[in-house]
């Protein structure tokens, strides 16, 4: 078994001084400080029970933090922002958009963009992945430089002992600082959660906005109906840009239309053209066609705003076609052969995304039809109804009538190592209580599987990803051919890449 060596744990989760050492300006020090800005599972549970949801005050606070690091919201306009919200596919849409712009940049046919920024979440292996320049994660050196720029500006503004913005807010501030400092002239920004009150929604005059496919997710924060969620997501629509979306449920579409009208803009529904086929794009899955066509429309709107619109069908443009073909977005319908095992990685973590993953996997029968060991490695930790998510995956898998029958199912936490705990850049305090991983979610999933599937497969719980991989390797030793599907969360997918020591970018 080839796995990466556990990395030294940099922190003690029980310490009130988490992340404050070493004091030197190193990447390790930056990660320590960043991790100190997370909330643990107990705090998040209290907030959920209180019904504390994002509101206007969230944006007041974010504007305050932006001013503390030396910027006004109007300063963000120079980045020519493409802003993307949605439940399913917003990350892929951002990746397609960035890839197209990179190919246009490479062609030299247009004067813009000279520097492309992209901000997405979460990351797979390294937090550097969240902030990209020209299609590549920023280096650890650049991350360290800009991290401490922001950290020290905040301390100078409010004092070293004052409360700082939480993890995602801090990284959002840092992304703005990186992009402005590096003279980015096309910034693709993925919303974290929702839209109206999301930390990214300080942009006053975006070049283009889009809401991808909608579904029920983060209901404790965004609302219990598709209409409520649509209202939140459409909060990114602004008067300065056409409001784009894809085909939606009628109740969602009505809300999007009304929200666009409120912002004095018009809603444009993008439908994949007949000439766009799965073999033209670099990410697997029929569900990517909608994300692809949204990305193409975002690029069109970007250049309309820049004053140099396309004068031909974009699907006949070589640079756009190359952007679709050469897109790189790891951990999404990704197939690899590692240690003589066929692996399928997909970080789907919503009902809609997991159903789409199941449908895609059912269409890839050649991956597992000869395998006598067929393993599902699944993780869910923080969503409202993890069993419903697992059911959605199985629904997609079984809907074709030719779905895979798993011989083994492993429900794992997203803790990386059994001795060292989390890999520092994968730390997720919001799934930890008293320095221990929260296992009850995995135990509930395992119990449901056993009750629903009986003895058709062997179901177990793994306290860490390392132990889950050890179980996979043990099964492999007794099998001729082994297939593993890793899904349920990007945190699990990234952790498996770490344990298997696989590069992402």
From Swiss-Prot:
Pathway: Cofactor biosynthesis; tetrahydrofolylpolyglutamate biosynthesis
Main location: mitochondrion
Location of this chain's protein in the cell: Mitochondrion inner membrane; Mitochondrion matrix; Cytoplasm
Domain of life, per lineage: Eukaryota
Residues binding Mg(2+) 1, per UniProt: 121, 190
SUPFAM superfamilies associated with the record: MurD-like peptide ligases, catalytic domain, MurD-like peptide ligases, peptide-binding domain
Catalytic activity field: (6S)-5,6,7,8-tetrahydrofolyl-(gamma-L-Glu)(n) + L-glutamate + ATP = (6S)-5,6,7,8-tetrahydrofolyl-(gamma-L-Glu)(n+1) + ADP + phosphate + H(+)
Cofactor note: A monovalent cation.
Residue numbers binding Mg(2+) 2: 218
Keyword set, alphabetical order: ATP-binding, Cytoplasm, Ligase, Magnesium, Membrane, Metal-binding, Mitochondrion, Mitochondrion inner membrane, Nucleotide-binding, One-carbon metabolism
Any single GO BP term: tetrahydrofolylpolyglutamate biosynthetic process
EC number(s) from the headed UniProt entry: 6.3.2.17
Cellular compartments per GO CC: cytoplasm; cytosol; mitochondrial inner membrane; mitochondrial matrix; mitochondrion; nucleus
Disulfide partners: none
UniProt GO molecular function: ATP binding; metal ion binding; tetrahydrofolylpolyglutamate synthase activity
The protein's required cofactors: a monovalent cation
Family: Belongs to the folylpolyglutamate synthase family.
Protein's name in the database: Probable folylpolyglutamate synthase
Name of the gene this protein is made from: met7
């Amino acid at each position: 078994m080839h796995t990466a060596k556990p990395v030294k744990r940099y922190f003690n989760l029980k310490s009130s001084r988490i992340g404050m050492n070493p004091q030197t300006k190193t990447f390790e020090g930056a990660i320590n400080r960043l991790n100190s800005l997370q909330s643990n599972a107990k705090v998040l549970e209290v907030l959920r029970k209180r019904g504390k949801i994002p509101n206007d005050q969230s944006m007041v606070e974010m504007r305050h933090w932006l001013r503390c690091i030396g910027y006004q919201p109007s300063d963000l306009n120079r980045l020519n922002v493409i802003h993307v919200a949605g439940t399913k596919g917003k990350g892929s849409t951002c990746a397609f958009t960035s890839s197209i712009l990179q190919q246009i940049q490479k062609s030299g046919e247009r004067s813009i963009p000279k520097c492309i920024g992209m901000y997405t979440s979460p990351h797979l292996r390294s937090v550097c992945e969240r902030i990209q320049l020209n299609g590549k994660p920023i280096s650890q050196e650049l991350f360290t430089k800009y991290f401490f720029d922001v950290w020290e500006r905040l301390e100078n503004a409010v004092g070293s002992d004052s409360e700082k913005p939480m993890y995602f807010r801090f990284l959002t501030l840092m992304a703005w600082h990186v992009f402005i400092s590096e003279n980015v002239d096309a910034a693709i920004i993925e919303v974290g959660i929702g839209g109206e009150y999301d930390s990214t929604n300080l942009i006053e005059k975006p070049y283009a906005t889009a809401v991808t496919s909608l579904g029920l997710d983060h209901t404790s924060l965004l609302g219990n109906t598709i209409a409520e969620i649509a209202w939140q997501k459409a909060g990114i629509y602004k008067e300065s840009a056409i409001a784009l979306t894809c085909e939606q449920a009628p109740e969602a579409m009505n809300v999007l239309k009304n929200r666009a009208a409120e912002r004095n803009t018009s809603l444009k529904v993008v439908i994949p053209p007949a000439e766009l086929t799965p073999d033209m794009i670099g990410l697997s899955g029929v569900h990517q066609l909608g994300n692809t066509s949204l990305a193409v429309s975002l690029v069109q709107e970007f250049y309309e705003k820049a004053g140099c619109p396309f004068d031909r069908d974009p699907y006949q443009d070589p640079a756009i076609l190359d952007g679709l073909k050469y897109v790189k977005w790891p951990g999404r319908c990704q197939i690899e052969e590692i240690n003589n095992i066929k692996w399928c990685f997909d970080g789907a973590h919503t009902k809609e995304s997991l159903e789409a993953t199941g449908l895609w996997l059912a269409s890839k029968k050649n991956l597992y039809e000869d395998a006598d060991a067929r393993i599902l490695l699944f993780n869910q930790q923080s969503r409202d109804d993890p069993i419903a998510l697992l059911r959605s995956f199985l629904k997609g898998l079984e809907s074709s009538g030719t779905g895979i029958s798993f011989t083994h199912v492993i429900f794992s936490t997203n803790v990386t190592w059994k001795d060292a705990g989390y890999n520092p850049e994968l730390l997720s305090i919001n799934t930890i209580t008293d320095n221990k991983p929260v296992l009850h979610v995995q135990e509930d999933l395992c119990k449901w599987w056993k009750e629903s599937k009986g003895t058709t497969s062997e179901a177990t719980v793994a306290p860490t990803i390392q132990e889950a991989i050890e179980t996979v390797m043990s099964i492999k030793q007794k099998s001729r051919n082994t297939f593993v599907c890793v899904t349920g969360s990007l945190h699990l997918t990234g952790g498996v890449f770490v344990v298997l020591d696989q590069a992402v970018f």
